[in-house]
Amino acid sequence: MNQPASAYFIEERHDPNETHTLSVLVQNEPGVLARVIGLFSGRGYNIESLTVSETENQKHLSRITIVTTGTPMVIQQIKHQLDRMIPVYRVVDMTLTGSSIERELAMVKVRGGGDHRVEALRLADAFRARVIDATTESFVFEITGNSSKISQFIDLMRPLGLVEVSRTGVAAITRGPEGM
């Protein structure tokens, strides 16, 4: 039997979640980051990664880079709500520009002895990770790259004696001569 046409009947859709990197240019003043985070937490949106820094070329402005997931409609809603905030100057969905560069840095501490030590160094070389601290019992590696490369490196270090990881979060910038 067909459903009656009604303003109250909403066809259920199951759009897949997508991951998007948003770059948000804001006034660098107290409370702005808390307001942006409040927008996400108040509506139940998840933040996968968050980085914030004052921009070099425009003083008193900061760039917030947020990696978030949601359906296309949720992502659109997040961008619209960010755009309406008073201290926000611009919101760019780096995922949609198609020509952006994303990088992350991680420091990875691994216990290292015997064969595990040799294997950890071999993997670090393969991933172009640098040794930034070494003792007879452990290493600290520094690795940069996209998030999946860093996650893969961490996964390979687990069986070798992974102790701890500190990740910076994603930084993103568009390619070419134009700015944000």
What residue spans do the PLM features occupy?
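Long, contiguous binding/interaction regions
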Residues: 1-62, 67-180
